[in-house]
Amino acid sequence: MLTGFKNAVEVDFTLEENKKKIEEAFKQAHAEAGAVYPLIIGGKKVETEKKIASVSPATKEVLGYACSCSKEQADEAIKASYEAFKKWSLTSVEERVRVLRRLAALLIENRFIMDAWNVLESGKNWGEADGELCEQLDFINSYVMHIQNLEKGKELV
């Protein structure tokens, strides 16, 4: 049996300091509303004329615009992902662990703004949004633990 895994703990929004942090995050998100988000194909930003509006289901506010890709751009992105996978498949366990831990650290560092955007874009409440972020952290941390154990020849269960 594997030991050492602990689930991420959800933010307690009854604490005043956390309420202030999420309220500041909402201010930041509203200030960023209306931004255009480009495609990223092979690491390069690509803006397109056609955009898809992200609209809050609760307020109907336009939160931003995602660039819409053509079939050719989708094909190009798929090709780029295959190339990235080839490189990633040669990446050492240590480097994969480093990358995943960095991802988890970035999620924690940006937790409140991530929660605020999730609330605005999905209509979820604060706790549900943070619960989803915790689930992301749990998956990442679980993957890290499992790849390290596989590298040591341990079984997953």
Go through each PLM region and give its residues:
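Terminal low-complexity tails and localization/encapsulation signals of metabolic enzymes
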Residues: 1-72, 76, 83, 90, ...
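Short linear capping/connector segments at secondary-structure termini
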Residues: 117-124, 155-157
